Amino acid sequence: MKRLIILIILFSNFAQADQKDERLSELFDKLFLSTNNMEASKLLFNIWDIWSIADNQETQIIFDEANQFMDVGELDNAIELLTKVVKQSPEFAEGWNKRATVYFLKGELNKSISDIEKTLNLEPRHFGALDGLAEIYLIQDDLVGAAVIYRRILEIIPSSKKSQDRLKLINDLLV
């Protein structure tokens, strides 16, 4: 009986995982309306938490191991595992986003952009992927591109101080 309960819990977590999770719509609605930084931070954390759950246990284990490699700076190992993740679960947006992040950290910006595009095709509201893309545009001195992306982030998170500040700075530079 105990094993059955554990299996049900495990299955229910994976059945409600990733960017297709029904809870996300409500969280994004609340995030859009939030004017309280503490509340917005909690909502962002909850969204990331949901995004970080793969649709199957095998992918989840590999994804978690890749995160551990990332945390200790073993980026090549992280990329190797994240490549397995996106091959096993190509609909798992956070797998693509995490690999985009590692490519960014390695300075492989074109590969990062490619994975960001895949992330955004799966989850257009992925503010983390959008923020990464804006950072790349800034590195490439594409202020107009970065401004467009910061506006997109503000459509999702109107209270984002970072996006507001960056957009203001870019607009001041473009004048």
What does each model-identified segment do?
Residues 16-64:
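N-terminal leader/linker segments that initiate helical-solenoid repeat arrays
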Residues 31-35, 48, 86, 120, ...:
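A conserved position within tetratricopeptide repeats
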Residues 38-41, 127-128, 157-168:
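Boundary/linker segments of alpha-helical solenoid repeat arrays
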Residues 56-122, 128:
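Alpha-helical adaptor scaffolds
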Residues 71, 105, 139-140, 156, ...:
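Register position in tetratricopeptide repeats
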Residues 99-100, 106, 133, 140, ...:
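Residue-level signature of tetratricopeptide-repeat
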